[in-house]
Amino acid sequence: PSVNARPCSSPLVCPAKGEKFFGVGSTSRIRRLPPHLAWCSIDWEQLCLLNLLGSGGFGSVYKATYHGATVAVKQVNRCSKNHLASRQSFWAELNVVRLDHNNVVRIVAASTCTPASQDSLGTIIMEYAGNCTLHHVIYGTGYLTGNSNDDLKCDHGFLSTAQAIIYSCDIVAGLMFLHSQLIVHLDLKPANIF
């Protein structure tokens, strides 16, 4: 949900003329996170997707468990209409990995490699912020899905003035922090605020 103010946050470097893109003598694609992100590699055997929370132009977000904790998993589509934009979006989102703020979702782990069964450009595991978005609160909708037996119930009624002020202050605090780090949120909308 955030983009670094620099033009491209991808660690990819274009090769010089005559060099192979993935290194001399290498015929297989080896994709790794940059060294400063190596600590957050995904342990795939510990990840269990539970249900789809939402999807958009660049990918899908799932509720999942990772090492026993409830998390949100964002998978960026490989076959998106704009592959370069998808890749830049993935790497830009990882720019928040170093940030620590109460109003910014933390990244737990990430990977550019995925199991063969998944057709994704990359996967980001984030802290789980809950089932209910600001969109649900504003419009008083009770569920993310139509099934009232799901655990996706949003327990809020309509948004009061006091709640609106609290939400507004939290949103502004998070945005001010991101802006102080030269990061701009490019998809700010009630459905993306938990």
UniProtKB/Swiss-Prot annotation:
Protein name: Serine/threonine-protein kinase mos
Gene: MOS
Residues annotated to bind ATP: L53, G54, S55, G56, G57, F58, G59, S60, V61, K74
Keyword ATP-binding attached: yes
Segments forming domain Protein kinase: 47-194
Reaction catalysed by this enzyme: L-seryl-[protein] + ATP = O-phospho-L-seryl-[protein] + ADP + H(+); L-threonyl-[protein] + ATP = O-phospho-L-threonyl-[protein] + ADP + H(+)
Cited InterPro entries: Kinase-like_dom_sf, Prot_kinase_dom, Protein_kinase_ATP_BS, Ser/Thr_Kinases-Pseudokinases
UniProt EC number: 2.7.11.1
Originating organism: Dendroaspis angusticeps (Eastern green mamba)
